[in-house]
């Protein structure tokens, strides 16, 4: 079994982990209403996808 010969320093450990950060989802603007949404998905605000209404969304008053 492989065992480290020396203790890994905090600097070396943190340098290795510098690329482990998570990124937020890539959002795009809806061409119909302008709200931000996930790509390749129906807009939750207006219900449009690829230029047509896919889901009927009720207006909140």
Curated annotation (Swiss-Prot):
It comes from the Bacteria. Residues 1-24 are annotated as: Disordered. InterPro entries: Ribosomal_bL32 (IPR002677), Ribosomal_bL32_bact (IPR044957), Ribosomal_zn-bd (IPR011332). Residues 1-22 have a biased composition (Basic residues). GO terms for molecular function: structural constituent of ribosome. Signal peptide: none annotated. Keywords: Ribonucleoprotein, Ribosomal protein. Transmembrane segments: none annotated. GO terms for cellular component: large ribosomal subunit. One of its GO terms (biological process) is translation. The keyword Cell inner membrane does not apply. The keyword RNA-binding does not apply. Gene3D superfamilies: Single helix bin (1.20.5.640). PANTHER family: 50S RIBOSOMAL PROTEIN L32 (PTHR35534), LARGE RIBOSOMAL SUBUNIT PROTEIN BL32 (PTHR35534:SF1). Belongs to the bacterial ribosomal protein bL32 family. This is Large ribosomal subunit protein bL32. The lineage of its organism: Bacteria, Bacillati, Actinomycetota, Rubrobacteria, Rubrobacterales.
């Amino acid at each position: 079994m492989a065992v480290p010969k020396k203790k890994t320093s905090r600097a070396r450990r943190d340098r290795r982990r510098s690329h482990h950060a998570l990124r937020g989802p890539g959002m795009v603007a809806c061409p119909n209403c302008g709200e931000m949404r996930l790509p390749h998905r129906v807009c939750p605000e207006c219900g449009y996808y690829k230029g047509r209404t896919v889901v009927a969304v009720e207006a909140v008053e």
